[in-house]
C-alpha cells in the first residue's frame, strides 16, 4: 500500500497503561488517584492523576498494569480488564504534563498511546491499609478536579463502559459491595453508576 502522505513522519509512540479503579464505600463511588508533584516554570504544583506509567520494553500490557498499580498504590492481585485505548495526538499537548513525564521517566517523550484498564472494588480497611505508604487516595467521583493528561476523559469513558456493562451483567455490582450488604447499599451503588 502506498503512503498517501509521503512527507508526513511516522509517529514515534510511547505506550503506557492507566488504571481506573472504581470503589464504593457504602455511600458513594470513588476513584483511586495518585498525587503528582512537580515544578513548572519556577512554580511548584500538586495535582492528581490516575495510577499509570509507561510500559517496559520486555513486559506485556497486563503485567505492566498490575506492576504500575502495585508500585503506585500498593494494591496487588486486583482484577483489571482492558476497556479502551486512548491515542489522541493531543494527549500530550499540555507542556506541564510533558515536562513532568520527561523528568519522571528521564527520557524524551513525544506521543503516548495509553491502554486503559478498569477495576471495580469495595473499599474497606484492608484495601485502605495498602494505600498508607503510597501517594494514593480515594476521591469521590463528584469531587474529581482537573487531572493530568486526559485522565478526566478516561474516567468519564470508564463510567460509560461500566453503565453499559452493568446493564447486561448486573452481577458486576457485587464487586463493589461487601459480602453482606443491605438493599439500600445495592440501590445506592446503582444510583451512583
Where are these regions (language model features)?
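A eukaryotic nuclear recognition-module signature that targets compact all-alpha binding cores
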Residues: 45-51, 160-172, 183
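Active-site-proximal cofactor/substrate-binding loop regions of enzyme domains
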Residues: 50-53, 61, 65
Amino acid at each position: 500500500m502506498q503512503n498517501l502522505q509521503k512527507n508526513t513522519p511516522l509517529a514515534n509512540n510511547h505506550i503506557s497503561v492507566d488504571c481506573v479503579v472504581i470503589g464504593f464505600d457504602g455511600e458513594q463511588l470513588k476513584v483511586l488517584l495518585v498525587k503528582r508533584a512537580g515544578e513548572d516554570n519556577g512554580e511548584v504544583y500538586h495535582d492528581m492523576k490516575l495510577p499509570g506509567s509507561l510500559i517496559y520494553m520486555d513486559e506485556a500490557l497486563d503485567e505492566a498494569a498490575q506492576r504500575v498499580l502495585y508500585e503506585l498504590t500498593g494494591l496487588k492481585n486486583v482484577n483489571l480488564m482492558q476497556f479502551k485505548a486512548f491515542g489522541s495526538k493531543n494527549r500530550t499537548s499540555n507542556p506541564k504534563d510533558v515536562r513532568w513525564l520527561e523528568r519522571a521517566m528521564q527520557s524524551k517523550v513525544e506521543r503516548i498511546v495509553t491502554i486503559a484498564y478498569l477495576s471495580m472494588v469495595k473499599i474497606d480497611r484492608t484495601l485502605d491499609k495498602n494505600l498508607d505508604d503510597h501517594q494514593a487516595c480515594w476521591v469521590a467521583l463528584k469531587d474529581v478536579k482537573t487531572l493530568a493528561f486526559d485522565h478526566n476523559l478516561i474516567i468519564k469513558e470508564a463510567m460509560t463502559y461500566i453503565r453499559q456493562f452493568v446493564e447486561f451483567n448486573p452481577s458486576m455490582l457485587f464487586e463493589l459491595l461487601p459480602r453482606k450488604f443491605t438493599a439500600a447499599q445495592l440501590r445506592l451503588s446503582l444510583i451512583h453508576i
